[in-house]
């Protein structure tokens, strides 16, 4: 008897166990062997199978199984599995005393017996287990992540008499000791083991018992696969993880080192010198290489600079380019541009343009195409080139020495006073590369935004508004709007470095050139630093790339020439969503009617669902453009006169890696009550962290502008979030909607719904709800703090913010009538 192992390394172990399930000796045949017989013509019953010896084999799916049942009694045996006799055919091949099964599957697992025909004697039995060891720790196992009981693993196997201390059953799966992964990835540690009795497994982190109680998102201990699974790892998960496998005959251990790399909030980095200038022979093939390093998902375009009507640049100074190749980093050979059978027309400048949600980077190279004879001379004449280099270098050194001599001679002369004339300010030379590029690789990429270099204007210029910062930017004809067609109105909000002004724009709607439309204008004040100016320009550039959507604040135009920078955006007459909801709360019992105040319209349950649905649509659009908001809250959603929800401030630059989230000072505030745990504790911002904030925003909507976590101090909030506490269901919210909020607040980011899924769910709910108005008796005051969140004197008990060091905010407003992106 034996087993022939396939070349793919069948792992097996063998145990012997006596079986005494039949009563022998009750009849006169007590001297006969206690071997179990299986009468011919009767199917084997698994519960009745008896053997003196069992062999257990572990196979991977796809292996070939080959069992031998050697016997001196006969040259032919019958094979049984479960309650079925095996027949020759298909994957099964029977030859004398040999059973062969090709390409085993999970269904082939079970008990196999070889039986002597006629007598029914069971000669041998085999237990076959088909297990996919390569996927033993993956999420798509058949148990779907179900956890086993650790106690079950330590029980003695029935009828076992062969004992053994724990040992590694698959050491080849444990070669990798160091795991260095970016934040947000899933990590699996495996320690596949065996022993008799079956050993138990424990996990230690840095030498201490580890059960994941204090980890955001918890862990999964998959005992049947001897694995530890951690989803959405963060920097605080770094450390040494040790598996301790033990039974009463011994113990073994193995350690893994986990290093979680923080995501880098930088635009793509291009390797210096690539692409490189290339000289090619006519008709040959050319390759340009562009090595891109980016933590955020990058998108890459290859551009060729072309001429239109004999000019390389348009009237606005932007070069004409042709997009040759567009792809993201996962595409095949995206960093290589192939040019086949090049001609003289292919000669020119080529640019590799790479971008992510943070910004853009580009590098260019020239292709020179030569006839075969010229290319041969170029290749054969290095000595001539070296001679030219020596001549030019010598000449340059001679000129440099002459210049030094002249300077030294002038220094010997007595100084003379000269009258200094006021310097004339000239525009800086620039290279405004056309951005035929979008944050999403599938977009049309028609934006012609320029890569700009900023310079301040002379102080002799007179700004249209006093105290407003001025500068020089290249003209972008697609977005430029004439200043003389703007009539500035009253300020809508003002902060330390910026202000928002209401204005009337004549002709900004090209279909109605003489009609005035109310808009909002963002301006940087004169005392703003270069960083505030740069932030506003970055916001403007990003809004150009984002395109237009009904549920976001859209860019309408810019004024960049002959004066301060104006960023013209849509105007929302009803202010931010938080104040919009609070103004429409039902009156309290002690309410006194005010004849001078016009009552606001009453909101129905359908209206509130519509608010959430519209915000989800806007966020789904931003997600499709790979834009992470990072500060989604009701205060950053604006409401138009037609009750259309518009997300604001998605273009603001936020340096999340430079913030101490635990330090409180008197200056600067952070919206901790809207932040996902991974963003709050580990500074990891993703679309999933925006989904968490959307859940809090939905809670705000159904409490009509309530303050999240009412009555809970910020310091206590940190502890409650780590322990898994969540806000209760609002009074006017259905169970289905509350469960949707709870899904948004799942501790594991990967388990939260996407904005696309949220849109689909809310669309379905919106289609089924009736216009039922809210119960006027519900006490909405329970969701309001004793003092307003926006006042600096409010205690930390109900403040929605925690403080950070003094980092100026571009648009930090006081009270406003209507705010746009502030």
Curated annotation (Swiss-Prot):
Residues 39-129, 157-259, 268-368 form the Ig-like C2-type domain. The keyword Ribosomal protein does not apply. It comes from the Eukaryota. It catalyses: L-tyrosyl-[protein] + ATP = O-phospho-L-tyrosyl-[protein] + ADP + H(+). Pfam families: I-set, Ig_3, PK_Tyr_Ser-Thr. Residues 136-166 are annotated as: Disordered. Belongs to the protein kinase superfamily. Tyr protein kinase family. Fibroblast growth factor receptor subfamily. This is Fibroblast growth factor receptor 4. It comes from Pleurodeles waltl. The lineage of its organism: Eukaryota, Metazoa, Chordata, Craniata, Vertebrata. The gene is FGFR4.
């Amino acid at each position: 008897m034996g087993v022939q192992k396939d070349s793919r390394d069948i792992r097996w172990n063998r145990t012997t166990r006596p079986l005494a399930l039949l009563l022998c000796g009750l009849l006169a045949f007590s001297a006969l062997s206690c071997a179990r017989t299986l009468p011919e013509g009767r199917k084997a019953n698994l519960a009745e199978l008896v053997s003196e010896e069992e062999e257990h084999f572990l196979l991977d799916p796809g292996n070939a199984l080959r069992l031998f049942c050697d016997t001196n009694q006969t040259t032919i045996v019958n094979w049984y599995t479960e309650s079925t006799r095996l027949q020759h055919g298909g994957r099964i091949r029977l030859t004398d005393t040999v059973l062969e099964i090709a390409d085993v599957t999970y269904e082939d697992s079970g008990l196999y017996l070889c039986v002597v025909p006629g007598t029914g004697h069971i000669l041998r039995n085999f237990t076959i287990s088909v297990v996919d060891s390569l996927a033993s720790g993956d999420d798509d196992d058949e148990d779907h992540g179900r956890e086993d009981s650790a106690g079950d693993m330590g029980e003695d196997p029935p009828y076992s008499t062969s004992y053994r201390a724990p040992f590694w059953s698959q050491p080849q799966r444990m070669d990798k000791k160091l795991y260095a992964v970016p934040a947000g990835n899933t990590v699996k540690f495996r320690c596949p083991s065996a022993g008799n009795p079956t050993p138990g497994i424990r996990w230690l982190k840095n030498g201490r018992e580890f059960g994941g109680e204090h980890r955001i998102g918890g862990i999964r201990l998959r005992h049947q696969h001897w694995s530890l699974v951690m989803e959405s790892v963060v920097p605080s998960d770094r450390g040494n993880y040790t598996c301790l496998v033990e039974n009463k005959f011994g113990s073994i251990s193995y350690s893994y080192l986990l290093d979680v790399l923080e995501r880098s909030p930088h635009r793509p980095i291009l390797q210096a010198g690539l692409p490189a200038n290339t000289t090619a022979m006519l008709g040959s093939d050319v390759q340009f290489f562009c090595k891109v390093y980016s933590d955020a998902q990058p998108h890459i375009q290859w551009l060729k600079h072309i001429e239109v009507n004999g000019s390389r640049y348009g009237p606005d100074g932007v070069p004409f380019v042709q997009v040759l190749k567009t792809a993201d980093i996962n595409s095949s050979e995206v960093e290589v541009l192939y040019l086949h059978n090049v001609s003289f027309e292919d000669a020119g400048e080529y640019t590799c343009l790479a971008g992510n949600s943070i910004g853009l980077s580009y590098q260019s190279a020239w292709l020179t195409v030569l006839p075969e004879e010229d290319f041969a001379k170029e290749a054969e004449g290095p000595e001539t080139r070296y001679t030219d280099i020596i001549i030019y270098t010598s000449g340059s050194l001679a000129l440099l020495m002459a210049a030094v001599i002249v300077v030294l001679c002038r220094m010997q002369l007595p100084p003379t006073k000269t009258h200094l004339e006021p310097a004339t300010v000239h525009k800086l030379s620039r290279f405004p590369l056309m951005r035929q590029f979008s944050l999403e690789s599938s977009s049309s990429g028609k934006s012609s935004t320029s890569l700009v270099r900023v310079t301040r204007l002379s102080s002799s210029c007179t700004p249209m508004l006093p105290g407003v910062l001025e500068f020089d930017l290249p003209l972008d004809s697609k977005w430029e709007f004439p200043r003389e067609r703007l009539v500035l109105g009253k300020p809508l909000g003002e902060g330390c470095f910026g202000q928002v002004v209401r204005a009337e724009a004549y002709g900004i709607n090209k279909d109605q050139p003489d009609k005035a439309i109310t808009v909002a204008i963002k301006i940087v004040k004169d005392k703003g630093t270069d960083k505030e100016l740069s932030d506003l320009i970055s916001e403007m550039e990003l809004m150009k790339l984002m395109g237009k959507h009904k549920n976001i604040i859209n860019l309408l135009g810019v004024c960049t020439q002959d004066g301060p920078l104006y960023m013209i955006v849509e105007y929302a007459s009803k202010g931010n969503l938080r104040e919009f909801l609070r103004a429409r709360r039902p009156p309290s019992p002690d309410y006194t009617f005010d004849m001078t105040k016009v009552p606001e319209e009453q909101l129905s349950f359908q209206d509130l669902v519509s608010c959430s649905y519209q915000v989800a649509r806007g966020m789904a659009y931003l997600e499709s453009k790979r834009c992470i908001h990072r500060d989604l809250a009701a205060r950053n959603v604006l409401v138009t006169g037609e009750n259309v929800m518009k997300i604001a401030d998605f273009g603001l630059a936020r340096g999340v890696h430079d913030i101490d989230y635990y330090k409180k000072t008197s200056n600067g505030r952070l919206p901790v009550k809207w932040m996902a745990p991974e963003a709050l504790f580990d500074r990891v911002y993703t679309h999933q962290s925006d989904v968490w904030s959307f859940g809090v925003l939905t809670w705000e909507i159904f409490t009509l502008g309530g303050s999240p976590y009412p009555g809970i101090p910020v310091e206590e909030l940190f502890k409650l979030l780590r322990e898994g506490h969540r806000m209760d269901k609002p009074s006017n919210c259905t169970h289905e909607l509350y469960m949707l909020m709870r899904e948004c607040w799942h501790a594991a980011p990967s388990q939260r719904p996407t904005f696309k899924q949220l849109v689909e769910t809310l669309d379905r709910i919106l289609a089924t709800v009736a216009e039922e108005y809210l119960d006027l008796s519900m006490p909405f005051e329970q969701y309001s703090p004793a003092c307003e969140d926006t006042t600096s004197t409010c205690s930390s008990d109900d403040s929605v913010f925690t403080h950070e060091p003094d980092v100026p905010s571009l648009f930090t407003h006081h009270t406003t009538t209507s705010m746009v992106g502030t």
